[in-house]
């Protein structure tokens, strides 16, 4: 729709009128790519206009700082105080697009940013050759929940070698009203109604769904014994990804001696056992992935630990440090890599 884009561009022009250089994507992009781009472009901050995994009436802001992480205290309070200080919107400076372009304040981000983002994800792939050997035999159903994941998820699956990818047609194209979804959240079983129907039609091995801003991943896998599709909680899928990644890194000699595993305090204690198994420092943080992303900056500033993996039970994890927020696209890559490294076994079996 025009309205959300117009509202976003209005904010852009206000920043430019205050002499702030702005980079804007030419079309919708996933939240983790925004986090990535903030650091790539050496920006002071980043803004994502999104309803995230909520109904459209909750459309709002996610704000990132120069490290690519969502803001935490005290910046969050300071920003809100500045917003409250505006009593008359007529006092807000604005500028037209042409003048902003001439002054070098309005900049469209090129498609090379997409390439750089995908390249960063692929660096986390551990068994590319093995995966390609079995990829032809795997059927994947995917839904972007009418959001931003459609293009990058299909691209990463294609570049990994997966050809049998079936996208839920009713939820493929961007739809700011989420017409087919009461609640576009991978945690909600009702959100998988269309995906499950398609999976049964094509006899899919696995179902993947990303929330509209593509930072949360939901997974269903076919039980080879019953033929039914079973869902995985955020704890389950997070631990499967963690075990796969850490075991493969250990086997290949890629684990850091001072590695750290970060989780939120409400997430499963199984993470403690996995961290111990791989001799990693377990760090617990408050609920919210921004506190996991914050730890990466602490590690770098203080030269203490190397980030190995982070997750929260609400269907979010981060593999690598290319972004500083949860990333469903890299989680898709890790999930299919884990599941199909064993060729004809499924996550339900494991």
Segments the model singles out, each with a brief description of its role:
Residues 2-13, 340-343, 347-349:
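Single conserved hydrophobic/aromatic residue that forms the stacking wall/gate
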Residues 7, 11, 58-65, 215-234:
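Short Gly/Thr/Asp-enriched flexible loops that form oxyanion-binding sites at enzyme active sites
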Residues 7-58, 163-218:
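N-terminal small/polar loop signature for handling phosphorylated ligands or for N-terminal nucleophile
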Residues 59-193, 198-199:
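Gly/Ser/Thr-enriched, mixed-charge loops and adjacent short helices
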């Amino acid at each position: 729709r025009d309205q959300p884009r117009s509202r976003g561009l209005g904010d852009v022009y206000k920043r430019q009128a205050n002499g702030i250089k702005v980079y804007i994507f030419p079309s919708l992009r996933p939240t983790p790519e925004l986090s990535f781009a903030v650091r790539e472009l050496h920006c002071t901050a980043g803004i994502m206009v999104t309803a995230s995994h909520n109904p459209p009436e909750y459309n709002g802001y996610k704000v990132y700082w120069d490290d690519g992480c969502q803001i935490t205290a005290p910046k969050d309070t300071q920003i809100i105080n500045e917003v409250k200080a505006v009593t008359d919107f007529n006092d807000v400076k604005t500028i037209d697009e042409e003048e902003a372009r001439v002054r070098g304040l309005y900049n469209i981000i090129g498609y090379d940013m997409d390439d750089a983002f995908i390249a960063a994800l692929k660096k986390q792939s551990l068994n590319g050759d093995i995966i390609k050997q079995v990829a032809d035999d795997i059927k994947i159903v995917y839904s972007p929940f009418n959001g931003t994941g459609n293009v990058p998820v299909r691209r990463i699956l294609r570049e990994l070698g997966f050809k049998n990818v079936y996208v839920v047609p009713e939820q493929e194209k961007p739809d700011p009203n989420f017409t087919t979804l009461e609640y576009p959240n991978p945690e909600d079983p009702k959100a998988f109604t269309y995906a499950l129907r398609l999976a049964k039609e094509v006899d899919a091995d696995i179902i993947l769904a990303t929330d509209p801003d593509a930072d949360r991943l939901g997974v269903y896998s076919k039980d080879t014994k019953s033929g039914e599709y079973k869902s995985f909680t955020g704890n389950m899928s997070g631990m499967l990804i963690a075990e796969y990644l850490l075991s493969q890194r250990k086997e290949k000699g890629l684990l850091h001696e001072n590695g750290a595993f970060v989780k939120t305090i409400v997430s499963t204690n199984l993470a403690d056992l996995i961290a111990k198994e791989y001799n990693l420092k377990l760090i617990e943080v408050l609920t919210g992935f921004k506190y996991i992303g914050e730890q990466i900056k602490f590690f770098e500033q203080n030269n203490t630990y190397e980030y190995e993996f982070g997750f929260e039970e609400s269907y979010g994890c981060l593999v690598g440090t290319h972004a500083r927020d949860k990333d469903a696209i890299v989680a898709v890559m890790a999930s299919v890599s884990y599941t199909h490294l064993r060729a004809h076994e499924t996550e339900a079996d494991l």
